[in-house]
Amino acid sequence: MAHKTFISYKYSEAQDLRDRIIKALGDDASYYQGETSDSPDLTDTSTENIKKNLKDMMYDTSVTIVIISPHIKESKWIDWEIEYCLKNITRKNRTSHTNGVVGVIMKVNGGYDWFKYTSTKLDGCSVTNYYDSKVYDIINNNRYNQHPKVYSCNQCKCVNALTGSYIAFVEEDEFLSNPQKYINNAYDKSEKDAEGYNLTKQR
């Protein structure tokens, strides 16, 4: 089943990946509610007008795709967009559902080591780590927040990459090869108002 999606991204460095994600959605791109290369330029518009346009795009969506790019934190909008998508917003007696969220890590210079690295636990388990300082607190606070936690390994206490965090991180190549898999995973976690996760909805 297709879900209405919104892509949150830093325009100056991620618009190409945004376009490739929309293309990878195939027929499901008709459910995409966010900006495209044909969207009007709002650069010189007031902050309130930009917010109104973004709210109109986001309100009816159920999954937010956040592009994790090197200068994401320089954006004035992304953390606000994530906060809006996580909240239950009421319009005309209808309350929106908390969105599922997936973070797509941009490939830079042919790889992802600008943001992720692997380490080995004492028991021999290999785990993926991330440079948390490169993303917003609202993203970090919704990582490893499954409740109760379900461990992939009870000895080293590592968790599943997709279900252990409300906001899972997925490499660009993996996401583009099967976007529906990761969109569905994000949506499934949002069911019953994200029951099973301790959500942080404030920036």
Q: How should these model regions be labeled?
A:
Residues M1-V63, R94-H97, Y166-R203:
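Conserved N-terminal substructure of TIR/SEFIR domains
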Residues S62, I68-S69:
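Juxtamembrane transmembrane-helix termini
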